[in-house]
Amino acid sequence: MSNPSPQVPEEEASTSVCRPKSSMASTSRRQRRERRFRRYLSAGRLVRAQALLQRHPGLDVDAGQPPPLHRACARHDAPALCLLLRLGADPAHQDRHGDTALHAAARQGPDAYTDFFLPLLSRCPSAMGIKNKDGETPGQILGWGPPWDSAEEEEEDDASKEREWRQKLQGELEDEWQEVMGRFEGDASHETQEPESFSAWSDRLAREHAQKCQQQQREAEGSCRPPRAEGSSQSWRQQEEEQRLFRERARVKEEELRESRARRAQEALGDREPKPARAGPRAEHPRGAGRGSLWRFGDVPWPCPGGGDPEAMAAALVARGPPLEEQGALRRYLRVQQVRWHPDRFLQRFRSQIETWELGRVMGAVTALSQALNRHAEALK
């Protein structure tokens, strides 16, 4: 008697068939909701967009081409941008061209710097180093100079060139050693002597070469030491004097702001005593005085007092440096100034000391000054 073949229950079979269909249906529903979320943003219905995301928290706020952050920057829609950042949108998310939201904000020009570029930069500073498919970073689109750590890259290039030169010298020494050893192989007078090993011979040649280079360098320094030493010491003195003036100006500004804060606090207390009925509005002055420790545009220690034309400030910095005849010293001096006034470095160091409503104006002036310094540096090449 043959055993009957096992039968699959009808309920299990229907369940296995429905699982792929249910997953596909859930995916299509999620995609429809994400498209509806983007339509709400485009139509300015931000409350409905936020409510939709609260009902369905698994939606991807960065989905779509172009992504929602890129669209908000292109339409100059600041409320939509703020909502997306609050909902967790990623400023480093790239579209099909490799652009991030910072790339899209940088292409909108100076008008979008405060409302779009700065909020994205504050949320994700690391996105400044992301390049698109054309090899551009957001800073390069804005016209900023090289990053402040370019001096380290130059040092790495110098180190790699030094390694290549040493490898080339080692190869030439090996070839010369082979020629010398082959020339004296048949000389019987040297058979009794201990032959010099290759390592000792190469070390001796390297020492002689280094001694010869040092001697030539000392002779060159001795022939023109007085003017070079004088120019070098003068350039360093100028740099030290400029740094001292920079620190002194910042210290004076802080003292003035501190005195102004104390004076405002005393005036607020004096006005509050005879008029107790108006104590509510007067109570706001100490808080305003507390904000006096932050810099406004005129409080920043610019190269020229109070700021002014970026070209004039750049010319003032160049005038304080070494003379134009000393091209090498002047290039090094300008590199130091480029690092000091680079927008990324300036924002990293002084952002917490500047009034929020003055930040856009200050960074605009710093960017213009950095570009002027870059032009002066390019003119020396």
Swiss-Prot record:
It comes from the Eukaryota. InterPro entries: Ankyrin_rpt-contain_sf (IPR036770), NFKBIL1 (IPR038753). The keyword Phosphoprotein applies. It is found in: Nucleus. One of its GO terms (biological process) is negative regulation of NF-kappaB transcription factor activity. Keywords: ANK repeat, Nucleus, Phosphoprotein, Repeat. Involved in the regulation of innate immune response. Acts as negative regulator of Toll-like receptor and interferon-regulatory factor (IRF) signaling pathways. Contributes to the negative regulation of transcriptional activation of NF-kappa-B target genes in response to endogenous pro-inflammatory stimuli. This is NF-kappa-B inhibitor-like protein 1. It comes from Macaca mulatta (Rhesus macaque).
